[in-house]
Amino acid sequence: MHFHWIAIVLAALAGFLVGGLWYGPLFGKAWMKARGITPESAAGANMALIFGTTFVLNLVAAFMLDHLYQTYDAPLGLHYSLVVAAIIGVGFVATSFGVNYLFSRQPRSLFFIDAGYWITVYLVMGAIFGLLA
């Protein structure tokens, strides 16, 4: 099995950048409100640890996505990669969030922000693999 290391690293970076946009200018204020986070409480966070760990977790996700694409004998191209990424994002991640958020009585807005982020991340990662791998 040959891993596509350039695509893996680029996909992880892209996921990280999507997060910066998603939880920053796009939905940052709504997410903080839904989570009950204030600017004061956010100021005490160890952002180096959070960002570093987030990037490592994005690397793991990208690596596993590459492994998944290679495990099944199917053509790798943009369309196929996006279909698989959508199945993962919507079919596994968003549904898992939905169940957890229902039982923990989280706001619907938080579900849409967080699930939408992961669907978008997997679609972006899938596009990168479809174009580069």
What are these regions (language model features)?
Residues 1-133:
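Juxtamembrane/disordered regions of integral membrane proteins
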